[in-house]
Amino acid sequence: MLAQVLRRQALQHVRLARAAAPSLTRWYASYPPHTIVKMPALSPTMTSGNIGAWQKKPGDAITPGEVLVEIETDKAQMDFEFQEEGVLAKILKETGEKDVAVGSPIAVLVEEGTDINAFQNFTLEDAGGDAAAPAAPAKEELAKAETAPTPASTSAPEPEETTSTGKLEPALDREPNVSFAAKKLAHELDVPLKALKGTGPGGKITEEDVKKAASAPAAAAAAPGAAYQDIPISNMRKTIATRLKESVSENPHFFVTSELSVSKLLKLRQALNSSAEGRYKLSVNDFLIKAIAVACKRVPAVNSSWRDGVIRQFDTVDVSVAVATPTGLITPIVKGVEAKGLETISATVKELAKKARDGKLKPEDYQGGTISISNMGMNPAVERFTAIINPPQAAILAVGTTKKVAVPVENEDGTTGVEWDDQIVVTASFDHKVVDGAVGAEWMRELKKVVENPLELLL
């Protein structure tokens, strides 16, 4: 009885001590006061991350705003800018460690003047162990892309070790369920037990099973397979795969294709770039981004998103621009395109594309967006293609390369001739839950009108 009373008092003391201590700080009798640095949630969809290069080593001082470590999230390679002051005492997760759950300890921070040698033997278990991977966010939360504080994660319970092995064994390493006689016979006949399916009680391999396997004709030698290389899947690639698979299965796509004459647009682009004196260099994509915004203001139903119970129609046009990076595709956003001029759009796209390729995008650079554009026009082999909608958006425009097309014209004297016209083929993908076929066609008509009369983009 006395032991139970003392135990309850001790537990109460521990609870009070934990309640008084900051959430990131743990105090241990055998170590000086210290703070446990945990894996942060750098995007709303992030549940785990890979550890990149540490920018600080044990003993280095850290000031607010300095980069502590590079972290590969489900979106991009990002810098973890630390917001506290102190000295790095111990690294718990080394460069290259993968799938570290949000909330798991990754390092130890102490105040300046603390002897960091006291932490030489400090382990992950001393910091509370790895956190359990948090559950995936609800779809509505993903759609809103709101950044919320990450709740403190609880440590995952250690698996109970068995007395026979001391640890849980992988299924492939377990001894097959086999009788002693069958095991002996298999050894004599050189029959691999792992390849057999037992017919005895509970799936046990019997002598008869071994005899049948030994008497069976040898399988023809398999032809040597083609050489291959297994490439590890990054968190970003996993996220791309998951989101696009969900988009195809949950968003009923329909497609509208049109040929657009860009002869006037190319002449206007050349004239503007010639007079810019190096201040800017407009691309065809810059004009198309602006044209998307104009079409969306004229047909606002396309600039919308499917939400639970409502269709949300946006007042501003935020265009997500697909950018290919060494680690995968990402879509940084040009916000408020309807209010921006071509020069500003061009500068913004160039800045975002550079940050994307350098892995320097912030969450606010790619979270959100109301409509997307994917342009493969720089590849002369791509005449046209269709793109998958970037959820929760309702539309994406796929742009092919520019080609010269012979078009018939009627001369003033009544004769007919041929002129060469620069054209591109564009295909818009629409979410039929949000956009009806007639609405998608109307949007494409407005886009065609403004692209083929590009002076309207300057209004």
From Swiss-Prot:
* Chain intervals for the UniProt region annotation (Disordered): 129-174
Q: Which UniProt keywords apply?
A: Acyltransferase, Lipoyl, Mitochondrion, Pyruvate, Transferase, Transit peptide
Its subcellular locations are: Mitochondrion
Q: Name one Pfam family in it.
A: E3_binding
Cofactor or coenzyme needed: (R)-lipoate
Instruction: Give all N6-lipoyllysine modified positions.
Output: K75
The protein's predominant localisation is mitochondrion
Q: Reaction(s) catalyzed by this protein?
A: N(6)-[(R)-dihydrolipoyl]-L-lysyl-[protein] + acetyl-CoA = N(6)-[(R)-S(8)-acetyldihydrolipoyl]-L-lysyl-[protein] + CoA
Q: Which is a Gene Ontology cellular component entry for this protein?
A: mitochondrion
Please provide, alphabetically and separated by semicolons, the GO molecular function terms listed in this UniProt record.
Answer: dihydrolipoyllysine-residue acetyltransferase activity
- Quote the InterPro entries the UniProt record gives: 2-oxoA_DH_lipoyl-BS (IPR003016), 2-oxoacid_DH_actylTfrase (IPR001078), Biotin_lipoyl (IPR000089), CAT-like_dom_sf (IPR023213), E2/Pdx1 (IPR045257), E3-bd_dom_sf (IPR036625), LAT1 (IPR006257), PSBD (IPR004167)
Q: Indicate which residues the UniProt annotation says bind CoA.
A: R269, S283, N285, R357, S374, N375
Q: Where is the Peripheral subunit-binding (PSBD) domain?
A: 177-214
| Marked site: May form a delocalized pi-electron network with Arg-384 of 2 other E2 subunits within the complex, which greatly improves protein stability | R384
> What is one process in the GO biological process aspect for this record?
pyruvate decarboxylation to acetyl-CoA
- Domain notes from UniProt: The peripheral subunit binding domain (PBSD), serves as a selective binding site for other domains of the E1 and E3 subunits.
Q: How does it assemble?
A: Eukaryotic pyruvate dehydrogenase (PDH) complexes are organized as a core consisting of the oligomeric dihydrolipoamide acetyl-transferase (E2), around which are arranged multiple copies of pyruvate dehydrogenase (E1), dihydrolipoamide dehydrogenase (E3) and protein X (E3BP) bound by non-covalent bonds. The Chaetomium thermophilum PDH complex contains 60 E2 units, 12 E3BP units, about 20 E1 units, and 12 or more E3 units. The units are organized in 1 E2 60-mer, 4 E3BP trimers, about 20 E1 tetramers, and a maximum of 12 E3 dimers.
What protein is this chain from? Dihydrolipoyllysine-residue acetyltransferase component of pyruvate dehydrogenase complex, mitochondrial
Q: Whose protein is this, by species? A: Chaetomium thermophilum (strain DSM 1495 / CBS 144.50 / IMI 039719) (Thermochaetoides thermophila)
